[in-house]
Amino acid sequence: MKVIISTLNSKYIHSSLALRYLQAYGRTKDEAYEIVEYTINMPILDILNNVTTLEADVLGFACYIWNIDMTLHLCSMIKAVRPSIKIILGGPEVSYTARELLEDHPCIDYSVQGEAEEAFTSFVKAIRTGHSPVDPVIPGILGREQGNIQGSEEAVEVKDLSTIPFPYTEEDMLTLGNKIVYYESSRGCPFSCQYCLSGNRNTVRFFPQERVIEELAWFVEHNVKQVKFVDRTFNCAPHHHIPLMEWMRDHGGQTNFHLEMESILMTEKEVDILSSTRHGQIQIEVGVQSTHNKTLEAIHRRNDWGRIQSVIPPIIKAGRTHVHMDLIVGLPYESKSIFEKSFNDLFSLQPHALQIGFLKLLKGSGVRSMAEYEYIANLKAPYEVLQTHVLPYDDVRMLKHFEDVFERFYNSERYRTVFGYISESLIQEGSAFAYFEEMTKLWLEKGNQERKLNDADQIAFLYEFFTLKGDQVACDLLRYDVLTSFNGKIRDERFGLSKDRKQEMQDAEIFWREESLVQQYIRNYSFVEWRRIRQDYHTIEVSGNALPYLGIPRGSYDTAEIAPSKDKEYVTYVIIIDVKGETKPFIRPQQCGDANLNNREHIASPSIREEV
């Protein structure tokens, strides 16, 4: 008997931990399952063609909000052309409405609810030995037999997680090299957040700590790029997570570990670890969701804003750990103005990424039954909220566009320097939300939401926005970010980076020919040919006010002030940027004469030669 277990991942870089757990547990009971993964971006007929060539007797799919509709469509076609295949579905989208699913979709034969390792293995054994998987009842298995739906609707748990083997093999490492590897050290959550499926039970179970460390070492030995923990609250038990974090810091190699952490549970110990680990070793995701107390009470969530303000900034300031923070649009009592405050609160902490999500009325979540908040939501997965009692649809729509613009520019981290400068002024005075809302309105006025823009188009939009704001420093820093983030590959007149680099070379010629001067900035430099200069370096002029945001103190030797050009009203500096993204400032020559550059006298560059 051939058993295939599958899922439709949302992206190619994703992989399914659930399927690998099923396969690993099945081996302990002498059951063999073959894993086949697809993505929701693949043509459904291509998936159908592949599935039907596998000649499966039992076919299982893991179902989530991103794939349930496509999975059901696929299963209806599979059943039509291969009616003998027994189809079983599992996953969060099945676990809370299993009977309804079987009633509405005759193509589905069985469902497994909850944690499926034990239940699915018992199901396969029953089918293989010719017995009914629903009579006698297998906890967690509901099915259709003789036209009747019968069995268990219970969402089961695996009580002893130590019975579940490590899910990855040497063979997996050959196929998952460029994908995110998912992992867990615990199941469950101690909190009761009503928007989340994990808020139903308030219990946490742990995998043995020594085993977890051994498995993390295995990932490091295999040079896994990123291990993403799916623990709902990684730092809920110090006796468990502190030794794991210390191990990551001390032995994590080049592997990056992604952890979801609860800020109100953070102690100085966690802050110290996250502030002293190797840069890029650990990244954390902190779900604040809202800073509005009435909202937090309604969703049964505890936040301590004072605590958040005390533990998050030191981690960010240390610069070792990437900090990602979350907000949710559409929570009870959170109008647009209240959301603006929550946004500004989190923005003031300057996380590396501030993700804006939209409330989803998940099956099995408490918020799905909260009629008093007058939710209007999409009836199809992912059940996203369209309107609430205090947030009309027009505001939701605007916030959707806001999120898109903010994600493209601030969260992309391609423009760190310019947004570092902007953030500083917005935190001191003004509203970050209002600033990005103004940017969003210009985006919509130009119809960009309906266009497919390349990187140069998006940079040109930012440059125009900064220009309309009259912000020369932002324009200068944007050009700097473009050169460093894109290695000089994107140049466009629309944002002041000409593709014709002759003028750039002419402005800087005397600098490059004065080897002793250049060596103050570039060790072991010697002039060879202009082609090498053009290949390895780019130069831009910036206003004096931009220098502090490039880490260059004004008035220093490296950035000696020069007289303004005739066509410019502000003092300018020339910055060298090499292809590695390092910044090297130098004096731009201005006047002719046999001057000594070390004395900051200004000399002019002769006309550029044809060799440029």
Positions of predicted regions on the chain:
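N-terminal [4Fe-4S]-dependent radical SAM core
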Residues: 1-3, 138, 142-185, 562, ...
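Short N-terminal binding/cap micro-motifs at the start of the first secondary-structure element
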Residues: 12-18
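A general structural detector for well-ordered alpha-helical segments in enzyme core domains, enriched
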Residues: 22, 47-50, 70, 74, ...
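Proline-aspartate-enriched helix->loop->beta-strand connector
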Residues: 55-56, 224, 351-352
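Radical SAM [4Fe-4S] cluster-binding motif and immediate context
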Residues: 162, 166-317, 321
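A structural motif corresponding to the C-terminal lobe/cap of the Radical SAM core domain
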Residues: 238, 256-265, 269-430
